[in-house]
Amino acid sequence: MAGNELLNSNRRRGSNVTNYFLIILFLFGCIQCVVNIQQDSFGDHHQEKHIEAFQRKHFLKSHLKDTKRKKSDASLENNDRNEEEFEEELDVHDILEDERENKDDNDDKEETLVGLNCKPHGGPMNELAKEMVYWEDIPIDNKFISPLQKEGKKQYLTFESDHGGWNNIRMAMETVMTMAVAMGRTLVLPPEQHMYLLDKGSSQRSYFSFAHFFEMDLISQEHTALEVISMDEFLKLEGLSGNLRDIKTGEIVFPPNNRTNYDGADHRTISKKLEAYLQQVGLVPPWDPEKCMMAFPTTADPADIKVLQELNNSAASVKMPTYENFIDKPYPVDASPFDRMKENWAGRSGLCIYDKEWQDAQLIHFAEGYDAKGARLLVHFYAFLFFEDWQQDTWMKRFVRDHIRYVDEIQCAAARIIAALRERVQSYGNDSGKYNAFHIRRGDFQYTVTRYDALHIIKNSAKEMTPKGTVYIATDEKDQSFFDPFRKVYDVVFLDDFKDLLKGVNTNYYGMIDSLVAARSEVFFGCWFSTFTGYINRLRGYHNNKEKGEGYEMGYHNSYYYALDDRKDHLHHFYPVKKSFYAREFPTSWRLIDKGIEEFQHLAINKE
């Protein structure tokens, strides 16, 4: 009996060992399968990366083949050399980088305000895209908070989009955003809507918010000074909760029909419903940029407000100098408040001071100046805002330069075209890859005095342009025969010549891409009165300041006007801001704005 029990016990033990062994074999097999799958996946992923790198390498060559141009022997030798260098760059910047262990594929999809990553947007390589970057990464700047921001009290700024073309809309938006930052208020973006001339195509987005052009979320995340929310969020948070009151009666007023989402609504609905409501519950400033400068005290202390009031009184008691007094004679950027005020006075009648009444308002609303009670903000932010503290002034100019820039999709599309342009120039034997550019404004432009014929424009610019050189023309002229005289003296290209590099890009972005391509030209000719030309010139100022190019200390750069005749070389002189502000951009927006960063610590208040 005992022997049988021992035998049975041994059998059970043997059976258990066998079971354990089978389980171990099964688990080992599962692990091996998983490893094989991962290796196959990595191999496929690795191969895809190589294919992607190969496509990036060859997209410029494919584009050049379409031009069907003959190349000289010297050009071919140069191209062979460039191709070898291109392959070396690919090895370093693409293939080896793609093979790094533990690299998260989602990293390529992350947008950032620092630098420019074109991988998620169809190229070009970052090595080629880096020339687009005029903005700087200044961590200490990101910590600055307006001393006018009220502790523990949420305040807002709302505004109505300008009804003009894109660059008028952008200009007004920049002004409003900088005011929100200066006031320490949350900026409320208007709803997504149709914008003038940005409504092309029924199969693509044709109504927009500013977040479709600028990295609003990233700006708000990176910058302690600015909070940005949508109109829908604002109306739900403050309107439906009964926190908004009629400015005149003090009674609680809810949004019309309790509606909060106006995205995609027509202009009439937005105007009659939403904007009328905001004008009812918000304090609407009567400030007119043509008549006054929007002045901000250093702090909310009544003593600082008094300083601005005394400055205003001083200006009223003397004859203020005209802009001619400051041509090529700017004050230092750290000059006294009164000197800086004189330089930017521009024949206005006084200061509009952000005093206690405005500082205490829960909501300030800027109404568009056509039918509303506010003034149209057709003015550059730096021509309207005045800061008692010069360091706050240069900080604000850096804020715009370093943060309010086009989204990566637009930047990268322009970078692809610029790379193709430079390789085109090199293929003709010019190793520098430099091209020149025009912005020729015609179309619906109301300033007919600038409507010169082609021969007049060629004659005005001949001295500065390179004979037979490559010229990029940004234009709204639809009649291609207008440019036949240009083709006789230059290798002329347009945005349409690079459509193969813009597949999948919303055509409503083409104007912005045009401006970025023109901004990187060696010599640029634009049109007086055009805000499109103006923005190109500001971008060129940013680039020249970063590169420490010739004349950067005075704000000069290698740009001209083909119209008007008497203003051709205005950008080779320092001009202070003057009316009409929108007609051009001024060097005060980019000149020496990095001065004083090292002493900025006392203003950088980190409230995180």
Task: Please place each PLM-identified region on the residue numbering.
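Short, low-complexity, Lys/Arg-enriched N-terminal segments of secretory-pathway carbohydrate enzymes
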Residues: 1-15, 47-56
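Secretory-pathway glycan-assembly enzymes, especially type II membrane glycosyltransferases
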Residues: 15, 21-32, 40-48, 54, ...
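A donor-sugar binding/catalytic signature common to diverse glycosyltransferases
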Residues: 174, 194, 509-561
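Short, charged/polar "capping" segments at the starts of alpha-helices
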Residues: 197-198, 447, 477-484
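Short, aromatic/basic amphipathic alpha-helical patches
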Residues: 203-207, 479-491
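Conserved catalytic-core segment of nucleotide-activated headgroup transferases in glycan assembly
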Residues: 445-474
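Donor nucleotide-activated moiety binding/catalytic core segment of transferases
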Residues: 490-521
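Leloir-type glycosyltransferase catalytic cores
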Residues: 551-608
